[in-house]
Regions:
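Secondary-structure edge/capping motif, primarily at the C-terminal ends of alpha-helices
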Residues: 7-12, 38-45, 77, 102-110
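C-terminal peripheral helix-coil segments that are non-catalytic and often amphipathic
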Residues: 104, 108-157
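Helix-loop "lid/cap" segments that line or gate small-molecule binding pockets
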Residues: 25-32, 41-46, 125-131
Length: 157
């Protein structure tokens, strides 16, 4: 639990200075490292009742990453504002399911070579309808560059 508090403190400060890519990368790493927790939480809680509070903390940290990414994207004109209050918070609360489901599928299919790039593609697939023209142009321009960065940054995970 202390590790989560340290991660949150460090991330909160560093988010102020990070690029959108670094925020996304760190969130994917975070979700990857704690995905078993999301997937197996009901069984874990039966064995360790205190795990519920840790789950809440992990989930809140994931939400903070996502909301920060979205807020920076809106501020920079890459994403549209919410169509209704709380729209992006719903996505932020549940994006772990995309990562967990995707990783499990690719691990079963033994497609580990491209799994992180595919996670980026799936996450962006959910964001894409909410991008502004400026955001779509930026995404199309940077997609290959980001895919290469992901391949490099995640090769040792």
């Amino acid at each position: 639990f202390d590790e989560l508090v340290e991660i949150e403190t460090t991330q909160r400060e560093s988010l102020k200075h990070m690029s959108l890519y670094k925020i996304l990368r760190n969130n994917i790493i975070f979700l990857f490292n704690y995905r078993f927790f999301f997937r197996d939480i009901l069984e874990i809680i039966n064995l360790v009742p205190n795990a519920k509070s840790v789950f809440k903390d992990v989930n809140k940290l994931n939400e903070k990453f996502s909301i920060e990414y979205i807020n920076i994207s809106i501020k920079n004109g890459y994403m549209k504002k919410e169509a209704f209050d709380g729209q992006y918070k719903i996505f932020a609360k549940n994006n772990w399911a995309i990562v967990s489901s995707s990783l499990t599928t690719w691990e079963v299919l033994d497609d580990s070579k491209n799994k992180y790039r595919k996670i980026f593609d799936e996450i962006m697939g959910h964001f894409y309808p909410f991008l502004t023209k400026k955001g779509v142009d930026r995404y199309n321009k940077k997609k290959n560059e980001i895919s290469k960065k992901i391949d490099e940054d995640f090769k040792n995970l």
